[in-house]
Amino acid sequence: RSCCPCYWGGCPWGQNCYPEGCSGPKV
């Protein structure tokens, strides 16, 4: 699965890879 944009909390087609937002690390 792809990552959602960092400024989104989540999206139907991907996972939230930026739980701390755009300023946080990608997980």
Swiss-Prot record:
Changing Y7A: Loss of binding affinity to cockroach neuronal membranes and of toxicity to blowfly larvae. One of its GO terms (molecular function) is toxin activity. The keyword Oxidoreductase does not apply. Its main location: secreted. The keyword Coiled coil does not apply. It is found in: Secreted; Nematocyst. Changing K26A: No change in binding affinity to cockroach neuronal membranes and in toxicity to blowfly larvae. Pfam families: ATX_III (PF08098). GO terms for cellular component: extracellular region; nematocyst. Changing S2A: No change in binding affinity to cockroach neuronal membranes and in toxicity to blowfly larvae. This is Delta-actitoxin-Avd2a. It comes from Anemonia sulcata.
